[in-house]
Amino acid sequence: MSQVRSDKPFTLAGRTYQSRLLVGTGKYKDMDETRDAIAASGAEIVTVAVRRTNIGQNPGEPNLLDVISPEQYTILPNTAGCYDAAEAVRTCRLARELLDGHKLVKLEVLADQKTLFPNVIETIKAAEILVKDGFDVMVYTSDDPIIARQLAEIGCIAVMPLAGLIGSGLGICNPYNLRIILEEAKVPVLVDAGVGTASDATIAMELGCEAVLLNSAIAHAQDPILMARAMKHAVEAGRLAYLAGRMPKKLYASASSPLDGLIK
């Protein structure tokens, strides 16, 4: 019997996860759809935009944590909507206070509202402060391998290069840069942003990414629950394909049946 190549665990901040799909909570039509889509995705880590979502900072308003329980999911507060380092640091500290000392955060510092590209200068500033302040920082960044390396050297526990513009659904726009980042990686690399459908998630995993984080691809689908299920299987299939190792590409045909013993 052939040997099945074993997989290493997906571990972040000392905790191991079965699912390599991380999902967001924005853009759903209501809390019920949010809950059902996340459940269908099989995700164990759920990211929340602290500046846009109530997780306790607005008493009297619906609280997302009432439907996405911290007892069931790892809550990953993010700094979406922040445009400078100081703003991002304040948001992370607020999240830590609201979540009883929670240290795991997703840092994103945006450059402008049109592209939502990361401002890498402000991102590096914020990362340095947060790491020194004891946070476990997962960081949204460009697909520049040098910036990704610097963020890892600062002490970020994961780097999350964009595959395409946030919310664009363009897919994996520059797989070659991602491959360079992956070759040099000393920390987990997760694709963040740009995934539009299941095949995009599979490609990211086939490249060797540890995991995929997405939101719009599910929330904006015609059937979010069904797309959440598709993404779950896509990530699993991509990981298995990566472990299996794809066949080499060839310019010309190669017969799959042996030539020996042909009937003459």
UniProtKB/Swiss-Prot annotation:
CDD domains to which the protein is assigned, alphabetical: ThiG
Cystine pairs: none
Function: Catalyzes the rearrangement of 1-deoxy-D-xylulose 5-phosphate (DXP) to produce the thiazole phosphate moiety of thiamine. Sulfur is provided by the thiocarboxylate moiety of the carrier protein ThiS. In vitro, sulfur can be provided by H(2)S.
Name assigned to this protein: Thiazole synthase
Keyword Chaperone included in the entry's annotation: no
Localization, UniProt: Cytoplasm
Keyword list, A-Z: Cytoplasm, Schiff base, Thiamine biosynthesis, Transferase
GO cellular component, one term: cytoplasm
GO biological process: thiamine diphosphate biosynthetic process
Active site, per annotation: K106 (schiff-base intermediate with dxp)
Binding site for 1-deoxy-D-xylulose 5-phosphate: G167, A193, G194, N215, S216
Domain of life where this protein originates: Bacteria
Organism: Ectopseudomonas mendocina (strain ymp) (Pseudomonas mendocina)
